[in-house]
Amino acid sequence: MTVSFPSTLHLHPILDVLLSQIPESCHSEVRLGLQEALVNAAKHGNNLDPSKSIYIRFRPIFRGYCWIISDQGQGFRPDREGADRNAYCYNGKEPSSLEDHERDCGRGLYILYHIFDQVEWSDDGKELMLYKRTSRWIFPSLFWNS
């Protein structure tokens, strides 16, 4: 499935579509993670420019689900300098120990790395791949005769 929309923070209907094919037991956690990723793409990638779009490809694979989120921004790579993902998120501190003004920077990344089993950016930093493992085998519908 592929979904695209202009940069916006009104994500409720988009999230509903993206969650429609995953087990309900995962909805709350995955909704939070996808919302953070989409807000980052709209706000930081596309600067909330409605003439720029966000594209999401979704696919069940192996024992989980994969989302690839693309924006039309300049690109982002938290690990470009070889930084540890937890060091980048909150400079290695636990979120609860941070001052209020420190919590916004890196909060979305912290959430992504704790919800999804795999988080990767493309070389140009314009695509984010998120993978969530589930406890059962997933068989994409293209393998089944209708």
What is the predicted function of each stretch?
Residues 1, 42-146:
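Conserved beta-strand-loop-beta-strand hairpin that lines the nucleotide-binding pocket
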Residues 1-32, 141-146:
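Bergerat-fold GHKL ATPase/HATPase_c domain
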Residues 19-24, 31-36, 84-86, 92-97:
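Generic detector of short, locally flexible boundary/turn motifs and exposed helical patches
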Residues 25-52:
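Conserved ATP-binding N-box helix of the HATPase_c
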